[in-house]
């Protein structure tokens, strides 16, 4: 089920080397989110910094905020650890390290727990329907009401979200048929 070709060589190398979920997730998020030391507005107009953090030391990210690389590394580690802890607390089926990384990227890190808990993905996964859950990840491809599949090649498109969902699905379904 997992389409390895959708994942980067760096992520695949980590998985094949037996890397931990935090290592896999760090590489994946570096590729998907980037790491900005200066605050910027995300696609929804929310001020973010580092790998998409909206809060730093309990305070919201504001326009003009700048951080050092060391501070971003700290913020990124906190956010990564929170996402993986969420997976450990809320997913009731056994998971491999790549699966934990895929779920952490999708649910708590990207769409947020508030949207994840009522989702078909979450319900299917905890019911043991892994194939169905991996299919449901790929449904989350709208941004501001527009279908991101229709924006491929557009300057201000959101097609990267379609690719990210395919990759999160590949991680979440890593070796489920074996």
UniProtKB/Swiss-Prot annotation:
The keyword Transmembrane applies. It catalyses: Hydrolysis of (1->4)-beta-linkages between N-acetylmuramic acid and N-acetyl-D-glucosamine residues in a peptidoglycan and between N-acetyl-D-glucosamine residues in chitodextrins. Its EC number is 3.2.1.17. InterPro entries: Bacteriophage_GH24, Endolysin_T4_type, Glyco_hydro_24, Lysozyme-like_dom_sf, Lysozyme_dom_sf, SAR_endolysin-like. The active site is at residues 33, 42. Keywords: Antimicrobial, Bacteriolytic enzyme, Cytolysis, Glycosidase, Host cell inner membrane, Host cell lysis by virus, Host cell membrane, Host membrane, Hydrolase, Membrane, Signal-anchor, Transmembrane, Transmembrane helix, Viral release from host cell. It is found in: Host cell inner membrane. It comes from the Viruses. It is a single-pass type II membrane protein. CDD domains: endolysin_R21-like (cd16900). One of its GO terms (biological process) is peptidoglycan catabolic process. GO terms for molecular function: lysozyme activity. One of its GO terms (cellular component) is host cell plasma membrane. It is an enzyme of class 3 (hydrolase). The chain crosses the membrane at residues 1-22. Signal-arrest-release (SAR) endolysin with lysozyme activity that degrades host peptidoglycans and participates with the pinholin and spanin proteins in the sequential events which lead to programmed host cell lysis releasing the mature viral particles. Once the pinholin has permeabilized the host cell membrane, the SAR-endolysin is released into the periplasm where it breaks down the peptidoglycan layer. Belongs to the glycosyl hydrolase 24 family. The signal-anchor, which may also be an uncleaved signal sequence tethers the SAR-endolysin to the membrane until the latter is depolarized by the holin, resulting in the escape of SAR-endolysin from the membrane. This is SAR-endolysin. The gene is 54.
């Amino acid at each position: 089920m997992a389409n390895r070709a959708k994942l980067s060589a760096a992520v695949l190398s980590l998985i094949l080397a037996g890397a931990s979920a935090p290592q896999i997730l760090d590489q994946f998020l570096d590729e998907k989110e980037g790491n900005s030391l200066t605050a910027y507005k995300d696609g929804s107009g929310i001020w973010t910094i580092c790998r998409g953090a909206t809060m730093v030391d309990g305070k919201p990210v504001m326009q003009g905020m700048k951080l050092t690389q060391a501070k971003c590394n700290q913020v990124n580690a906190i956010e990564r650890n929170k996402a993986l802890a969420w997976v450990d607390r809320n997913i009731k089926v056994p998971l491999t390290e790549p699966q934990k990384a895929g779920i952490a990227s999708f649910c708590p890190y990207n769409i947020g727990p508030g949207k994840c808990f009522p989702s078909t993905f979450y319900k299917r996964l905890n019911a043991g329907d892994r194939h169905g859950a991996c299919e449901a990840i790929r449904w989350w491809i709208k941004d501001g009401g527009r279908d991101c599949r229709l924006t491929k090649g557009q300057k201000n498109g959101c097609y990267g979200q379609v690719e990210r969902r395919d990759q999160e699905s590949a991680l979440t379904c890593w070796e489920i048929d074996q």
